[in-house]
């Protein structure tokens, strides 16, 4: 403890931390989860209901306006402009993470905002994606000048979404391990974030040149893949160039057909878990390991980075192990498809869990920090008190907007709803894979155990937060 | 039929486990709301720019009066985060904070210049 505090402490991004959920609420939630799960098993349907999207187009005019070239150009330009502002503010602004536009914009507004809007409105990141906008503009320019389409290498199918899964872990590692000076949520400094954004831009554009813009966005570009995954939960989607409505959750059933998709959703769950646990459930373990390294002559900062990295990797392996045990269990049920098919076939059932974890852990941070984003960070993006663009530079965050009770109910509600949706998808997939519904129900004892494990682990993390 | 019976038994078991869990955990929760630091003057002593005895933990219920004094051997600004109250302290001097617990959550106070946390304050609903 004392050694950890010998490290220079970065400002926590947010000055109010959540209270751990009280034991009675933990018990209620866990009870509801158990009871709901049991009744889900016995009262469930026998034919798959989510394998078909039942897609219906919205009015042609509205679809054309929203998807047309002017809207695409405008959204792309906004995306490129905001990325530019974030990089500029990171390089030229203050190094205090809470006063600089960059950190809140990248790690709160974008990283937590797009998941929310993706679920509600569909894949909204796609038009705003700055790298896609640059890639398409350059590609279009090349086509006009050279009179031919640019040639690309065929993307190696077996790599699938693995680059995105690894990238997602790397992004979160950068956010909470690399910059962590003593266990704060976003300890990264603005300058480092801006440099990372520039490096990622170079890497992404290079990959787009190699494999093609849309191909890379579909498989390797971290944010496209991740936000796109979450958008599959919602009821808005584009099909054959037209915007339409579909049955909620149905698009998720076709998401995990690309290799590495399971790794993406497992990476998301484990990243959120690690962030929630480092200050609570894992705190003692992290301190113990940290001291072990320090006693063996590793420097303080190095020891903390190594320790956090180990715990993050273990979290990923742990989450993956729980899922793979569930898959393994299902494969023992009579009439089961091959293990490989099961492994990718049930990956999408974890997407609601990943989203629930995200809401549970970052809901309050988002509510507080968006107040900053749209007041003082907008008026004074550099945080140097040199500008007051919209007259809101001296505003503060009102921490009273949500009570501790409201936060608890949102957290627990998110986990319970995510649990139910995950079970729904898993049961539905089982009815598609097992012709006999009794065998399908039997296979689902395994997925039920997986979901209960994730939900109770999530509740447990919330109950010991900051303990 | 027998599988329906088995289900009924498992269902009953699940409900029993849930109820037991609820009762056991609910029982644990009573009592921690009573002992708070509300209204009592607490003193945090800072030596060599570090809080003596480690970061001080203080707990309040919403609506209680928060009252603590920081005695410091270094000059700095004490910043109570979340409530956003800042007060200067001179080397060898002391400064008193006295305000109502209006915001729930966990908050830090630190020596702002040195980024040294001296207090972790919990305000329960």
Q: Where are the language model's segments positioned?
A:
Chain B
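Core hydrophobic alpha-helical transmembrane segments of single-pass membrane proteins
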Residues: 11-21
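N-terminal Sec-pathway targeting helices
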Residues: 2-13
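Extracellular/periplasmic metallocenter environments
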Residues: 7, 21-39, 89-125
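N-terminal edge beta-strand
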Residues: 35-65
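Beta-strand-rich interaction surfaces with strong enrichment in secreted/lumenal proteins
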Residues: 56-58, 84-88
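Beta-strand cores of secreted/periplasmic/IMS beta-sandwich domains, seen most often
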Residues: 56-74, 96-110
């Amino acid at each position: 403890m004392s050694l950890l505090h010998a490290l220079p402490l970065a400002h926590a991004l947010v000055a109010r931390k959540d209270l751990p959920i009280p034991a009675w609420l933990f018990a209620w939630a866990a009870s509801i989860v158990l009871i709901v799960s049991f009744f889900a098993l016995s009262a469930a349907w026998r034919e798959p209901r989510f394998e078909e999207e039942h897609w219906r187009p919205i009015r042609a005019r509205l679809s054309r306006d929203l998807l047309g070239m002017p809207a695409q150009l405008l959204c792309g330009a906004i995306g490129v402009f905001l990325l530019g502002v974030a990089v500029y503010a990171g390089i030229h602004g203050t190094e205090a993470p809470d006063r600089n536009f960059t950190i809140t914009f990248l790690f709160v507004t974008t990283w937590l905002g797009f998941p929310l809007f993706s679920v509600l409105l569909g894949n909204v990141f796609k038009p705003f994606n700055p790298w896609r906008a640059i890639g398409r503009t350059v590609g279009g320019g090349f086509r006009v000048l050279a009179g031919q389409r640019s040639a690309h290498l065929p993307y190696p199918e077996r790599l699938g979404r693995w680059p995105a899964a690894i990238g997602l872990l790397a992004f979160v590692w950068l956010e909470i391990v690399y910059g962590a000076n003593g266990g704060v949520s976003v300890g990264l400094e603005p300058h480092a974030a801006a440099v990372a954004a520039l490096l990622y831009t170079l890497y992404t554009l290079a990959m787009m040149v190699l494999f093609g813009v849309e191909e890379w966005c579909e498989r390797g570009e971290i944010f496209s893949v991740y936000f796109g995954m979450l958008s599959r939960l919602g009821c808005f989607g584009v099909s054959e160039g037209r915007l339409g409505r579909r049955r909620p959750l149905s698009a998720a059933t076709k998401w995990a057909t690309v290799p590495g998709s399971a790794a993406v959703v497992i990476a998301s769950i484990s990243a959120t878990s690690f962030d929630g646990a480092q200050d609570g459930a894992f705190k003692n373990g992290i301190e113990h390991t940290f001291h072990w390294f320090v006693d063996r002559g590793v420097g303080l900062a190095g020891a903390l980075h190594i320790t956090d990295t180990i715990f993050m990797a273990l979290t990923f392996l742990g989450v993956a192990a729980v899922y793979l045990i569930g898959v393994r269990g299902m494969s023992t049920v009579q009439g089961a498809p091959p293990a490989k098919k099961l492994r990718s076939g049930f990956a999408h059932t974890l997407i609601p869990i990943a989203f629930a974890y995200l809401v549970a852990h970052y809901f309050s941070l988002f509510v507080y920090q968006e107040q900053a984003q749209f007041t003082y960070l907008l008026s004074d993006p550099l945080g140097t008190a040199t500008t007051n663009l919209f007259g809101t530079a001296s505003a503060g965050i009102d921490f009273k907007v949500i009570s501790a009770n409201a936060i608890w109910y949102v957290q627990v509600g998110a986990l319970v709803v995510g649990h139910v949706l995950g079970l729904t998808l898993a049961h539905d997939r089982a009815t598609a894979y097992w012709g006999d519904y009794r065998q399908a129900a039997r296979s689902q004892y395994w997925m039920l155990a997986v979901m209960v494990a994730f939900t109770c682990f999530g509740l447990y993390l919330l109950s010991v937060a900051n303990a | 039929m027998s599988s329906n019976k088995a289900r009924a038994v498992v269902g009953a078991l699940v409900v029993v486990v849930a109820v037991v869990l609820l009762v056991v955990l609910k029982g644990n929760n009573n009592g921690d709301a009573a002992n708070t630091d509300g209204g009592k003057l607490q003193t945090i002593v800072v030596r060599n720019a570090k809080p003596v005895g480690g970061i001080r933990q203080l707990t309040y219920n919403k609506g209680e009066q928060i009252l603590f004094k920081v005695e410091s051997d270094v000059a700095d600004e004490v910043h109570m985060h979340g409530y956003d109250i800042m007060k200067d302290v001179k080397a060898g001097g002391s400064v008193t904070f006295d305000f109502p617990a209006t915001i729930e959550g966990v908050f830090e106070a630190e020596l702002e210049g040195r980024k040294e946390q001296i207090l972790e304050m919990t305000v329960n609903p």
